[in-house]
Curated annotation (Swiss-Prot):
Region annotation Disordered: where it falls in the sequence: 24-80
Keyword Hydrolase attached: yes
Gene designation: notum2
EC category: hydrolase
GO terms of molecular function: palmitoleyl hydrolase activity
Pfam families reported for this sequence: PAE
Keywords of the record: Glycoprotein, Hydrolase, Secreted, Serine esterase, Signal
Protein name as annotated: Carboxylesterase notum2
Length: 495
């Protein structure tokens, strides 16, 4: 697998930054095989993980301590509060597995007395053929099996147990579901034969994993819940779109009376405007639509029935795109989406800071922001800043980002209050408490709270104009003021 493809896989992870402070264990409680790296870390892979990229969003990776290595156990015990950690539980139904046949599971941090549950689906793109799955298994095995999962994890952002980092949801029961099915949480296919030697017959059971997680949580208090939030980033966000109504129905069947809501972060993609290699032999050359078309057959993927009925046989891949699926979803949804999502740009071969940028690509970037904005206008609850980044809710500084003076944390709280005072489909915001927030300004980074752009070579912050100039754009020809900071003018435009 070439380095570009490997880097793309890492960029699409969208995983949570966590700390693990116990030894790895297998489902039976026996020590797992030792990984090549003795200090396994679950980190958020943002643009800074890409060797081909010269820019990163500041704050894309949360700071974390590394408990691995000799003599670190006592130190980590004093630094970390065990009560804040999520503990690993493997599924009771052992027939529902990860890609490689190892046990699937979830991490849980209970908050005694709480009737609110936050269930988070991890992201990580997908594989859609024997070749792409073999490459994925070789380079990122933890996204296809549970052998090296840590016994505990610590959440960040909306998954944090710290009130200052997570003021509205710190006191909820928090569940983190690791992504190990590579099927955008849609698969319904068991392996046809057991693993033989080095040859692996992959299972794709993402949809079933979610079902079994819900079943296993019912006796742990989920049945008594008043509010259940199914959240996810990137591929996990798309997984929320695909599974939210099924989760609601399953809980109803289990006798629960909870209101089920969905939170979709960076999982609202648009179809590519530029057709790439038709056969798309690897992830680097495959658009989301092409990957989903191929993957659906491999995964025996399941999409919401109401949406599926709108398309001809073999065309149900359309239901993976939020702007086409949204109107067929019954459960309330809150969509979080950067208007200039880095992964959406990468689909179009636009890599900020790592290559030249043509005038056509610059124009396309601006049009992308407009198209995304237009696709979100009828979404009841939305937070869409005009920034260059990918994923938001698991960043440790997630409360810093604002639109028109309102943070995402505040918008979520306003959305929560709206259920107590209004119909779920009402667009009437509570006075001074909005939850439909889309930046008005048209340019990338025109919101003053956007994550900073960092030059990876110098680690210095750069303005958007500096980035564009470094990529070869003639700013004067485009009518951009090279002498001043244009952000002030853009912000006054309503951002």
């Amino acid at each position: 697998m070439n380095i570009f493809c490997h880097a793309l896989f890492l960029l699409l992870l969208g995983v949570v930054s966590c700390q693990n402070n116990n030894r790895n264990v297998k489902p039976g409680g026996k020590p797992a095989k030792k990984p090549n790296n003795p200090a396994i870390e679950a980190t958020q892979h943002g643009p800074e993980a890409d060797p081909n990229s010269g820019l990163a969003g500041a704050g894309d990776s949360s700071k974390e301590t590394n408990p691995g290595g000799r003599g670190s156990s006592q130190q980590s015990a004093s630094v970390n509060k065990p009560a804040d950690d999520m503990k690993l539980h493997f599924l009771k139904n052992t027939a529902v597995t990860c890609n490689d046949g190892t046990a699937a599971g979830f991490y849980l941090k209970e908050f005694k007395g709480s009737k609110r549950w936050l269930i988070f689906l991890e992201g990580g793109w997908c594989c859609y053929s024997k070749e792409t799955c073999d490459s994925r298994y070789k380079t990122i095995p933890r996204l296809m099996g549970s052998t090296d999962w840590p016994q505990t994890r610590r959440g960040s952002g909306l998954l944090s147990a710290q009130v200052d980092e997570n003021p509205h949801w710190y006191n909820a029961n928090i569940v983190f579901v690791p992504y190990c099915s590579s099927d955008v949480w849609s698969g319904n296919k068991a392996a046809s034969k057991p693993k033989q030697g080095k040859e692996t017959e992959y299972a794709f059971m993402g949809s079933q994993i979610i079902r079994e997680v819900i079943k296993d949580l019912v006796p742990k208090g989920l049945k008594q819940a008043k509010v259940v939030m199914l959240a996810g980033t990137s591929a996990g966000g798309t997984g929320v779109l695909l599974n939210i109504d099924k989760v609601s129905s399953l809980l109803e069947q289990q006798g629960a009376e909870a209101q089920v809501r969905g939170l979709v972060d960076s999982g609202w993609f648009l179809e590519s405007k530029q057709q790439k290699v038709p056969d798309c032999p690897d992830s680097a050359s495959c658009t989301p639509a092409d990957a989903i078309k191929k993957g659906l057959r491999l995964w025996n993927g399941v999409v919401p029935e109401k949406c599926k009925q709108q398309y001809k046989r073999g065309e149900d891949w359309h239901c993976f795109f939020g702007h086409k699926l949204y109107s067929y979803i019954s459960a309330p949804l809150f969509v979080v989406q950067w208007l200039f999502d880095e992964e959406q740009l990468r689909v179009e071969n636009i890599y900020m800071g790592s290559q030249s940028l043509s005038e056509q690509q610059w124009t396309y970037m601006q049009n992308l922001g407009k198209e995304l904005k237009n696709s979100l206008k009828d979404v009841t609850a939305v937070f869409a800043p005009s920034c260059l980044s990918h994923t938001l809710i698991t960043k440790s500084n997630w409360t810093d980002f604002q639109i028109k003076g309102t943070s995402l944390s505040r918008a979520l709280q306003c959305w929560d209050r709206s259920f107590q005072e209004a119909n779920k489909n009402s667009k009437t915001a509570l006075k001074g408490c909005p939850f439909h927030l889309i930046d008005n300004c048209q340019w990338p980074q025109c919101n003053p709270t956007c994550p900073a752009l960092i030059d990876q070579a110098t680690q210095q912050e750069m303005t958007l104009l500096q980035v564009l100039a470094s990529m070869g754009l003639d700013l004067q020809k485009l009518g951009l003021d090279v002498r001043g900071d244009i952000s002030a003018g853009m912000v006054s435009n309503g951002g």
